Design a protein with these regions (language model features):
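Active-site histidine-anchored catalytic micro-motif
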Residues: 132
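Terminal accessory/targeting
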Residues: 2-6, 16-112, 116-127, 135-252
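DG-centered beta-turn motif at the end of beta-strands
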Residues: 9-13
Length: 252
């Protein structure tokens, strides 16, 4: 049986280099979708590039509370999320800490603004995921789900459920994935990083996350980090073969 998988490139619009790498990955047929940072430094140019390269209909939203400048004012008064006018990663390191009422309202307003900005630019969003997986946090998840539903987004990324995961985290992830589907969201059956399936059989209906970028030699890679100011990683893989067909989120 031919297996169908989704390859989603995160961080579109983050900067010029990674956005052009994602465009090249589309041209090579290596990815099926990308999710956009509405507060990315290269957003306008990235959207124009998506139109030019004919993948404007394959864009989702990459919800963000951890990097760059917020689009709204209220969240700037929430020090667990913003300091010095830019998002920090304070709350992301303490996801089990309850949110205050004002924080919940500010988060909802910010996520709504991010989606609205992309919609105003003409993007018909196919799905949602998030920067540093903030949409899976126990207290942020209901807010993200509610905002996405209000915008008619009914497809969302799972919590990672393939690869090496300890017993406690596996339970947490399984509960989230069940909850997400109970909220009415359409999902894949599995979600993995490239390293989770590099030497394994890829199950049918899996989403694989990649971060296309160019290394210092201009090679298209799946970015795993930075070194000396340049992205480092492995060559962006081609998962296509006789047993695997790529599909987009629109086909899910």
């Amino acid at each position: 049986m031919t297996k169908q998988i989704i390859i989603n490139a995160d961080d579109y619009g983050l900067n010029e280099r990674n956005s052009k790498a994602i465009a090249q990955a589309f041209e090579k047929g290596l990815i099926t979708n990308t999710t956009v940072l509405a507060n990315g430094d290269y957003l306008d140019e990235a959207l124009a590039l998506a139109r030019e390269k004919n993948f404007f209909d394959k864009l989702g939203v990459h919800l963000n509370l951890t990097e760059g400048e917020p689009l709204t004012e209220d969240i700037k008064s929430c020090p667990r999320f913003v300091s010095g006018g830019v998002f920090n990663k304070v709350y992301n390191k303490r996801r089990t800490s309850p949110l205050k009422k004002a924080e919940k309202a500010a988060i909802a307003k910010e996520l709504d603004a991010q989606i609205s900005k992309l919609e105003a630019a003409g993007v018909k969003l196919t799905h949602a995921d998030s920067h540093h997986h903030i949409h899976t946090g126990v207290f942020i998840a209901p807010i993200a789900a509610r905002v996405c539903k209000a915008h008619g987004i009914n497809k969302m990324r799972l919590h990672r459920n393939l690869g090496s995961i300890n017993a406690v985290k596996r339970i947490v992830k399984k509960r989230y994935n069940r909850w997400l589907r109970r909220q009415g969201f359409v999902t894949t059956e599995y979600f993995a990083y490239v390293m989770d399936i590099r030497d394994s059989v890829i199950p049918d209906n899996t989403e694989i996350m990649v971060h296309p970028d160019f290394d210092k030699d201009g090679v298209l890679i799946d970015r795993r980090g930075m070194e000396g100011g340049f992205p480092i990683g492995y060559p962006l893989p081609d998962f296509r073969n006789d047993d695997i067909k790529l599909k987009g989120y629109a086909e899910l």
